[in-house]
Amino acid sequence: MVQLYYGSDTQNTHRVVQETILPLFKRAGVAVHDKLIPELCDNDWRDHDFFVLGVPTWYYGELQSDWEAYFDHFKTIDFKGKTVALFGLGDQWGYDEWFIDGVGILAEALIANGAELVCPWPTKGYDFQKSRALKNAGEFYGLALDEDNQYDLTHSRCEAWVKLVVAELDSRLTSIPLAV
């Protein structure tokens, strides 16, 4: 089962998770357990191996408030043997120097603590100046969504990215619990 953990202040991330990402996983036959960041406990990380993490970026490259409050603890978690796919929301035109920096902030901590990051996303089709979320010149560490300027692309981007995540699961697991 996939564990999907995320934070959301304005409900944009929550809406994308509930109305788009979770239904896409269900349609693919993948069981997903979702939780908001304030609901997490240490067992949520210890007892599972495959995670999808969602983070909107705020203001000038800052973490969303739940992630910000949790981040000092997050940086202490041992992610060796854990697989993580990331997605983030940001505003590539209004905050073009910090586009989805939250993804990069999480990625840095995850890599430092042994996680394997999967399902990077191409930078093609975005217009921004800088981002901490860049894995390399052509890829973000995870899916980049812009509900402010490219909301019309959210569903198709999520659809393509969820297919990548499902393929990654298929390559790792002998059986995926089916959604009920």
Show which residues each predicted segment covers:
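A structural signal for isolated positions on well-ordered beta-strands in alpha/beta enzyme cores
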Residues: M1-Q3, H33, A85, V118
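N-terminal beta1-alpha1 ligand-phosphate binding loop
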Residues: V2-L24
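Short acidic/polar alpha-helix capping motifs at helix-coil junctions
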Residues: L4-Y6, K35-P38, Y70-H73
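FMN-binding flavodoxin-like domain, especially the glycine-rich phosphate-binding loop
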Residues: R27-A28, D47-V180
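A short beta-strand-loop structural module common to alpha/beta enzyme folds
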Residues: A28-C41
